[in-house]
Regions:
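Bacterial N-terminal signal peptides
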Residues: 12-25
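Extracellular glycan-recognition surfaces and repeat-rich motifs
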Residues: 46-88
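Secretory/extracellular carbohydrate-interaction modules
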Residues: 84-156
Length: 267
């Protein structure tokens, strides 16, 4: 089984055994409106157990995911005026589906929640099985999953919302460009029956919530108890945030003291 493969002297493989006391300490959100955050800061010796708001470490998983070839990077993905710290996680293009999942300490299933993350296409766009897709999933209790990112069919050059697997695709105005970091923010409104999801692409950090976005209203997730990184293409992902307010998933600032800097983007 492939695993998260740290570079530069970090762990050689994903550690799946965690000490309960350490997990509980890491799983408690620092603020009431912050549900979870993952900046991919190394946490030796439990590398895959960093961040906050989770009930355990990252592990291989996802529909038809037979590998998890994600590599921790020393540097972060960055976005203007968005606070960042730690490193990031990347993957090359693969001939099979890759996936890693992580359980939330606080499941999502009522009210409004915001999810944000940074994503950057790498290598040759569309390389990898199923046109080199990549993104983040919200995994529901009814057998449904929301996919946020670059799809494997349809509008393969844009960021979308869709059912994991490609059904119900909703296009955004954001295009996928190799080497360019993009901030994706999803407003998830959980309600009886179908939920309502709105995707904002590259909103300004520290600004008010946008009035428009790509809207998906044909999916009922039930209760979301885990998130996933799901891909076959070359990309990097960073700064996953989940909170009950828009402001908390877009904290303003620059690099934190623990950050060694940003991945350089082409001009």
């Amino acid at each position: 089984m492939d695993s998260l493969r740290p570079r530069r002297g970090l762990l050689a493989a994903l550690v799946t055994v965690a000490f309960p006391s350490m997990v509980l300490a890491l799983a408690s959100p620092a603020r009431a409106d912050v549900v979870a955050r993952e900046s991919f800061v190394p946490s030796f010796p439990l590398y895959a157990n960093g961040g906050s708001g989770f009930a355990g470490p990252w592990r291989q998983g996802g529909f038809n995911a037979f590998a998890s070839g994600y590599v921790p990077e020393d540097r972060s993905l960055c976005h203007p005026r968005l606070r960042n710290e730690g490193g990031s996680v990347s993957s090359v293009a693969h001939p099979s589906i890759n996936g890693a999942i992580r359980d939330l300490a606080q499941p999502l299933g009522a009210g409004t929640v915001y999810v944000s993350f940074l994503v950057q296409p790498l290598g040759t766009l569309h390389a990898g099985v199923f046109n080199g897709f990549f993104g983040l999933t919200l995994n529901g209790s009814l057998g449904n999953e929301l996919f946020i990112g670059k799809p494997g069919a349809g509008a393969v050059s844009q960021y979308v919302l869709e059912n994991r697997g490609g059904f119900g695709q909703v296009l955004s105005n954001g295009s996928t460009t190799t080497g360019r970091s993009t901030l994706l923010v999803v407003k998830a409104q959980f309600m009886p029956g179908n939920d309502l999801f709105t995707l904002y692409v590259d909103p300004a950090a520290s600004a008010t919530e946008p009035t428009g976005g790509a809207v998906k209203a044909d999916l009922d997730l039930g209760t979301v108890s885990r998130i996933g990184i799901y891909s076959s293409g070359a990309f990097a992902i960073d700064e996953i945030r989940i909170a009950t307010t828009y402001a908390e998933v877009l904290p303003s600032g620059g690099q934190a003291g623990s950050s060694p800097g940003c991945l350089v983007e082409p001009r």
